Amino acid sequence: MASAVLVAPIVLAGCGSDDGGPPLLTWYTNPDNGGQATLAAECTESSGGAYRIQTQVLPNDADSQREQLVRRLAAGDSSVDLMSLDPPFVAEFANAGYLLPVTDPADVDELTEGVLEGPLLTAYWDDELVATPFWANTQLLWYRQSVADAAGVDPTAEGFTWAEMIDAAEAEGKRIGVQGNRYEGYMVWVNALISSAGGQIIEDAELGAEATPTVASPAGDAAAEVVGGLARSSAAPSDLTTAGEEEARSLFQSDDGSFMVNWPYVYQAAREGVEGGAVDQDVFDDIAWARYPRVDADEASRPPLGGINLAIGDFTDHPDLALDAVKCITSVENNAQYMVEAGNPAARSGAYDDPEVREAFPMADLIRESINDAGPRPITPYYGDVSTSVQRTWHPASSVQAPGTPEDTDSYMSEVLAGERLL
């Protein structure tokens, strides 16, 4: 079933302020360490009594978050004033009429000023601002300095490629940490490789089911050569077919570790591991970082893009107050605070100049650059179909061939989008 075909409506009662106090805004959040609840309290305070914000935590995984929000919004639930939304779902929700667009040019300017280019691309649908980047994310290349030195490579060099990285790991008898399980993290990897090679997974994404799959291309072949080449090399991790972010991190910190592509949280996790005795200090001191590796030495990489956008529910009873709350939550100051306290990178460029951010993230400038230059996953109401098509035709990684796999993906995806194949 196409992901743009939404769950049937259910009857839900909206929430409001029935105690005579300021209007109550409900913010549906993804799970975090409490940072969003803190921002809700602080913005409530700074509103001077104009509104109150309560948070409602969604399930852990993105698919369950989407399902719960869709059920409420399909029922016209006015209690969904604000929602933390995974960027790939923005187009689907906006296309269904679930998100309240920001139309006043002054408001658009305020919400987008200083927002990095990568996340800003995910906030629009049909030329309207339908969400505001709250925090962003990207993957860096993490490497063990001792391994790079022994192999005689410099991962910070401008033209450093996946092929060079694989050769270096093989030469030193080490393994590379990637996300090879059949899940969204694998789609993130494949999309980043295709984008880095100058291609895209679909064209005319705004056409929805009429979009054209374009994986079968020189860029798709180049991406397949990286995935299949790594999988069939001695640098592949033994658990490649089931590896996610945490498996990659565990490998990287082990004696077999060499290189890894992963989100910035791994640095803080390693530091906390040292404090807790789970990671040796010499391992932490050996960790270095660089920009996401290139597919082609002559073409800059387009690193992965993640994060959360903040959207206003179209059925809210308090659209103006919800907009004011979004402005508060996504301010530069709160972006910086959330990055330090929750460990999630900021969507606004100015937050990276904050002294506390720079202390917590020595690679802050690289994170900012990477997010700005990142390649978003396809922006389409049928994103679930597109992602699942890639995951099913590219897994396991050891089966990926060029040519072959890209053509299979286009055929499979075309049938899914046309309703000729069920997922």
Task: Specify the residue positions occupied by each region the protein language model found.
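Extracytoplasmic/periplasmic solute-binding protein
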Residues: 130-134, 139, 163-219
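Conserved C-terminal helix/tail region of periplasmic/extracytoplasmic solute-binding proteins
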Residues: 149, 369-423
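Conserved N-terminal structural module of periplasmic/extracytoplasmic solute-binding proteins
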Residues: 2, 8-91, 108, 415-423
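C-terminal lobe and pocket-closing loops
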Residues: 265-283, 295-393
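Hinge/lid segment of periplasmic solute-binding proteins
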Residues: 87-138, 284-290, 359
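A structural signal for short loop-to-beta-strand junctions that line the ligand-binding cleft
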Residues: 70-72, 79-81, 109-146, 298-302, ...
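Glycine-centered hinge/linker elements that transmit conformational signals in sensory
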Residues: 167-170, 208-241, 288, 292
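Short, solvent-exposed loop/beta-turn-alpha elements that line the ligand-binding surface or hinge
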Residues: 103-115, 158, 180, 199-222, ...
